[in-house]
């Protein structure tokens, strides 16, 4: 039996909430909270006939730590699942620490304002020291490890599929299947067809920033950065067929390099159709990728 507060009600959050409601013996009570409560109410109404999980809803601005703290205190959950935007990771982690509640998310922190001078100074220092220029990295959240440990709390970071299940697969392989692991290649393939010329599978802003950024991979103990989409491979996926895939920077490379230090090379590839790439480049050419006003 558990009470879970789920912050977020977008595409990824909706899938996670549906899956939680399929195991009501584990997730006995869920509160769905978002900036727009009407979205939470609609999802709760859809789920009500399908599950015995008790579902309530709430409004919260996850950018404001005091609002998150107030909601946690009111609902008293065992776990907060942060499936909002990665911009809000630190705010929600701070609220969990203040309230003594366990934390879980699906994507590591990146700032909403990448021009903030204080953040920029830390970022540029990390770029020089680490060797990759992605806006997102684990350093901000890993810095919370001691705080959560001293509070007797658990914080699970990147607990989606990739990152998340991918690291679990690698850890299982290391423990049970191999004496040592030399190389890791993660291949992310979407075999679906929604019929649209262009659409993202999760938050468009985050997706487009991730794909249009320089790629990078881990090799021989250091990062190698490359121009965006400059390494392409063709791969035939079981039950899906041949797809074009491109090397991207992805957060699990960072955690795998830390936890499987013997790996000589770690890479991440994702499949994209030509129509998606054409639309993305068009948006990029007119300055519509990024947070700057046009």
Regions found by a protein language model. Name each.
Residues 9-10:
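Glycine-rich Rossmann-fold phosphate-binding loop(s) that bind the pyrophosphate
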Residues 13-14:
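N-terminal Rossmann-fold NAD(P) dinucleotide-binding loop
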Residues 36-39:
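Helix N-cap at the beta1-alpha1 junction of Rossmann-like dinucleotide-binding domains, i.e.
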Residues 50-64:
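Rossmann-fold cofactor-recognition segment
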Residues 60-77, 84, 88:
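Conserved Rossmann-fold cofactor-binding substructure of NAD(P)-dependent oxidoreductases
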Residues 107-153:
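Rossmann-fold NAD(P)-binding glycine/threonine-rich loop
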Residues 175-293:
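C-terminal catalytic/substrate-binding lobe primarily of soluble NAD(P)-dependent oxidoreductases
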């Amino acid at each position: 039996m558990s009470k879970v507060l789920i912050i977020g009600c977008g595409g990824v959050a909706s899938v996670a909430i549906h899956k939680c409601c399929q195991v009501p013996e584990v997730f006995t009570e869920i509160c769905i909270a978002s900036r727009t409560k009407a979205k939470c109410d609609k999802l709760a109404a859809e789920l009500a006939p399908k599950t015995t999980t008790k579902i309530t809803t709430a409004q919260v601005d996850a950018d404001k730590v005091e609002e998150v703290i107030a909601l946690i205190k009111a609902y008293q959950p065992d776990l907060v699942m942060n499936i909002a935007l990665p911009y809000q990771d630190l705010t929600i982690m701070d609220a969990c620490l203040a309230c003594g509640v366990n934390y879980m998310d699906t994507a590591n922190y990146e700032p909403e304002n990448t021009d903030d001078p204080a953040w920029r100074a830390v970022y540029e220092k990390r770029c020089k020291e680490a060797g990759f220029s992605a806006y997102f990295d684990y350093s901000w959240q890993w810095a919370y490890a001691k705080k959560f440990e001293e509070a007797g709390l658990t914080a699970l970071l990147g607990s989606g599929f990739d990152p998340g299940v991918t690291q679990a697969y690698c850890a299982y392989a290391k423990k049970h299947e191999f004496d040592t692991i030399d190389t890791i290649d993660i291949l992310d393939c979407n075999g679906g067809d929604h019929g649209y010329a262009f659409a993202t599978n999760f938050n468009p802003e985050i997706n487009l920033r991730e794909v249009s950024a320089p790629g990078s991979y881990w090799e021989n103990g250091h990062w190698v950065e490359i121009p965006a989409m400059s390494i392409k491979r063709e791969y035939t996926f079981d039950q899906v067929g041949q797809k074009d895939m491109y090397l991207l920077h992805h957060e699990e490379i960072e955690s795998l390099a830390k936890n499987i230090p013997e790996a000589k090379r770690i890479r991440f590839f994702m499949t994209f159709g030509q129509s998606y790439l054409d639309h993305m480049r068009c948006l990029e050419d007119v300055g519509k990728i990024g947070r700057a006003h046009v």
